[in-house]
Amino acid sequence: MKLFTGLIFCSLVLGVSSQWYSFIGEAVQGAWDMYRAYSDMREANYKNSDKYFHARGNYDAAQRGPGGAWAAKVISDARERSQRVTDLFKYGDSGHGVEDSKADQAANEWGRSGKDPNHFRPSGLPDKY
């Protein structure tokens, strides 16, 4: 009986730990997706494209699974919080205030919810992105 109980307990522990490995892997890949979208946004330097890249990064990360969606939310929220702080010191350089931050968060949520990020894609943005 003790052997049976031990085997059940070990299988439960291993099952839970494998879920954590999956979550962590998804989170790392999701963070990479967010970085890639940010890097593409900086490279493209295309007017009115930031909402598209916000939505795309969140969409790509969320497609990884719960870990990717979690990473996308954490990174997006941290980015918007830091933007609000920098706006206090240098308005306009890091965004356009509260309205822009709310629009960014809406684009983030749009992407995380699985909706098509191309909804925010500006016309004329090169196909590379």
Swiss-Prot record:
UniProt entry tagged with the keyword Signal: yes
Pfam families found in the cross-reference section: SAA
Tissue and organ distribution: Expressed by the liver; secreted in plasma.
Keywords: Acute phase, Amyloid, HDL, Pyrrolidone carboxylic acid, Secreted, Signal
BP term (GO), one: acute-phase response
GO CC terms of this entry: high-density lipoprotein particle
Family, similarity comment: Belongs to the SAA family.
Secretion signal span: 1-18
Residues the record lists as Pyrrolidone carboxylic acid modifications: Q19
Chain residue ranges for the region called Disordered: 92-129
Protein known as: Serum amyloid A-2 protein
Subunit structure: Apolipoprotein of the HDL complex.
